[in-house]
């Protein structure tokens, strides 16, 4: 009984010392500065990529438009659709995109049916 109490007391003492050592550890300002720079660089790269994509999509290809013949019209429509889709994907947030629901579709999730 005494050895069990002693083991519990030693375990509690070790936990208290470990927590005290972690909270009392000095924070490294270089690490904090590095993390801030990396976060700023990541958002800057993402904004730069969106800017270049928008610029690329907004440039008209004059040589293709001037030499457009009637049989090329369906291909031009497809290119316009692809361009619009790329613009939508660049402007929209993929994490916030709403899911399309189908009529009468049901999913089985955790013992219940939910509509898709």
UniProtKB/Swiss-Prot annotation:
Q: Origin, by domain of life? A: Eukaryota
Q: According to its UniProt record, where is this protein located?
A: Secreted
The keyword NAD appears for this protein: no
* Positions in coiled-coil regions: none
Q: In which tissues is it expressed?
A: In the pancreas, somatostatin is expressed in delta cells of the islets of Langerhans. In the stomach, it is expressed in parietal cells of oxyntic mucosa and in the small intestine, it is found in the villus (at protein level). Neuronostatin is expressed in the pancreas in delta cells of the islets of Langerhans, as well as in the stomach, in parietal cells of oxyntic mucosa and in the small intestine, in the villus (at protein level).
What does its PTM field state? C-terminal amidation of the neuronostatin peptide is required for its biological activity, including for the regulation of mean arterial pressure.
Q: What is this protein called?
A: Somatostatin
Native organism is Mus musculus (Mouse)
